[in-house]
Amino acid sequence: MDRYKAHDMPLGWLLPNDGYGAGYGQTDTLDGNIANLKSLADYARKNGVEIGLWTQSDLHPKPEISALLQRDIVKEVRDAGVRVLKTDVAWVGAGYSFGLNGITDVAQIMTYYGNNSRPFIISLDGWAGTQRYAGIWSGDQTGGVWEYIRFHIPTYIGSGLSGQPNICSDMDGIFGGKNPLVNVRDFQWKTFTPMELNMDGWGANEKYPHAFGEPYTSINRWYLKLKSELLPYAYSIAEESVSGLPMIRAMFLEYPNPYTLGKATQYQFLYGPYFLVAPVYQETRADKEGNDVRHGIYLPEGQWIDYFTGDLYEGGKIYNDVDAPLWKLPVFVKNGAIIPMANPSNNVSEINPNLRIYELYPHGSTSFTTYDDDGVTEEYRTGRGVRTLVESRVDGKNNVTVTVHPAVGDFAGFQKKKATEFRINVTQKPSGVSAKIGENSINLAEANSLEDFKSRENVYFYDRAPNLNRFATKGSDFEKKVIAGNPQLLVKLAAADITAAPTVLSVEGFRFEPAEKYRLSSGALTAPANAAVTEENAAAYTLKPTWDAVPNADFYEIEFGGMLYTTIKGTEFLFEDLEAETPYSFKVRAANRDGHSAWTAVSAKTKANPLEFAIPGIEGETSVENQGSSLAKLFDFKEKDVWHTKHDAKAVPFDLVMDLKTINWLEKFHYVPREDGGNGTLLKGAVYYSMDRENWTKAGTFQWDKNGDVKIFGFKDAPTARYIKLHVTESAGDYGSGREIYVFKVPGTESYLPGDINNDGKIDRNDLTSYINYTGLRKGDSDFEGYISNGDINKNGLIDAYDISVVATQLEDEADQPQEEADKKDEEEDKAVGDDEKKKAAEEAKKKVRVDGTLLLSADKKRYSRGDAVKVSVKGRNLRLVNALSFALP
């Protein structure tokens, strides 16, 4: 809390961890720990922060549990003042009832023992009904990579479509990190989501918003402050989501058409009725500072305004090459929007209850109903809340009338007397401004400056170029950067009873006509020449049309699938997520301020992808020598090179063992022999599979013709395995050879990499961190089942040294380099000996790589009394290649 305050960062709540060996108190009793928690909660509330718990323990006391991990949710709520609960792995449970009953119990306790407090629960997982008491967080994921942002966008959209509007995820992941560009982009788009959650202590770097220094600290602070300003809008659409549309809305919910009803808009969403958010989720044309562009932004019918620059976009098109410098999230406001706001704050205690702010983009006739209540109790369920209807109308003479109707309703702490501030987006100074409350006209004075405006009431000010960069770190280079938005008319009215009469603002001579952003050049345009999809630009799921540049063109447009892709700056454009082996047609034209050229038609067909479910990264080993390093060529997805056993040496019978590196549901494998079916073509043998390379199950036999045709072996009942063994008994010329072996998993199934405990598809330090934190967790512990149990590689029901060793020995900076040096040394030794000696050396090396030795445990006494210390001595005898030891009490 002190750290966030020192860096002027918003912070709403803090969740100490009650488990994973941490606990929230370090005393010898549960009551002592509750008192410890209360002292933290008291300090937090003095600083405007609420306290919750990140829990993986039971809710109620159990005598057999140590004080460190004891729980008493009643005392935590009643005595310590806990108001937030984040549940974890242990809360998923078996079936529906476990988790649902748990959050129901907590919700009722929070209300009953917490002075009618409103339950705030965030759960790892859930089912139908979870939304009644809990929101959802997406679980332990790895940040620092663009994939983290990419997959979360449709995840959030899908949550809303599933009836769960309250969705969040760890900022930049709980694991990983060390990529400030991804970090900033994650903070940006999640400004327009219900909640943001920092999970620190598990990643490659601290997960604070200021972890990377400048300019990232300044940008993250800007977006967190913006989120605080948008709280009245967010709260209003949150209340709507109780019985209406979710806060994060799939495009088709508001704009259903053939384009939005598919996957085409899965990387953008509506935040309430007025904001359209298109997160930066990949590098498109980024420079080293992270300045980039965003393709594929579909703006529906109507007019849309860049929230930061004020540029105006006509809807019904798909915009590309949209500027996205590092500081800028592509976010658009629908023309006509009415956005209730608050003063920027670091927590809700800093929000001015005597001020209401409305930002407007007047266009036609629009309305929005704001909602507010006490924010902390269950009284809203009985109707204790306040609604305010705001209407905006632009007439045929460009006069704007904004009517804020009397607030309706009441709640404890509601301040009826409020000042009202309007922010009207314009492009030139209006000719007249007036206001009245009920029948009473307000005498408005024009302020001389923004500072003058802030210090007075019943005043207006034309802000010609608002500097949006208001929260940069003092003295930083980013503070010097002026980021100008479109002009605004600012109006502030003195405090009045907002329930008594309507407040009406009238603006004469309203104009919002931004300068054209894209159409800048003039001159005749010719149809693009040489438009085509070349062979190298066609793939199974993508096509990239290219064309020659056209003189006088500002940008290009492509018509595809009944949609217009516009503002394409270059002479190529990539279409993704297409169907394999499917013909497609495009039309390309050039555009400038004078219009557009004639169309040029392009047709192309996507290629086939027969290897979609072929497993990559396979490594092989044979029981006989091979010609050089050719065995690697059997699994490199290149059919032009060949594997061959050692020339002039009989190979059969021999074994070929394939390490898939991942555990898969096996469907089949393809053996691609030499094109002529010549020497080494495999003809007869048997196939086995295994999880551990020690216990093998026979899958069947093969008998293949001696020709160059692809040979197919199918697995019955889709067994699960990591290893496949071919025992070859007959081959052409008694050798072994082949161009490729493709092993296919069952279509649509996932591969699991042993040791990848955080399930991000790779072994890295994030996995090691998790293993260390979960060391000693065993079957029967509440949070063992699930992805933690997947980390039990040797399947002994315990996260132990064996499991940790599997990961630690694969880390590049600690294991690979010494092994590379050892391999180099082995190669040098091989050069100095003959073939026979090499074989003997290889056999000896195999013996040496086996872990061996004995552990002897002895106690210092034969008998012990209560309270005695037990000393156990451990000695190793003839230990070989041991890099870790596990000890645990039964």
Question: What kind of feature is each model-predicted range?
Answer:
Residues 575-594:
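Beta-strand-rich modules
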Residues 520-551, 580, 598-610:
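Pro/Thr/Ser/Gly-rich low-complexity, intrinsically disordered linker/stalk tracts
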Residues 1-328, 334:
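Catalytic-domain carbohydrate-binding cleft regions of carbohydrate-active enzymes
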Residues 864-890:
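Low-complexity, serine/threonine/proline/glycine-rich extracellular segments that form mucin-like
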Residues 746-864, 871, 887:
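Cellulosome-associated attachment modules in secreted, modular CAZymes
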Residues 335-440, 456-458, 462-521:
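Accessory, solvent-exposed terminal regions and/or long lumenal/extracellular loops of proteins
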Residues 284-301, 409-431, 885-889:
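Surface-exposed beta-strand/loop patches in extracellular or lumenal glycoproteins
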Residues 580, 636-698, 707-752:
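Aromatic, loop-rich ligand-recognition surfaces of beta-strand-rich domains
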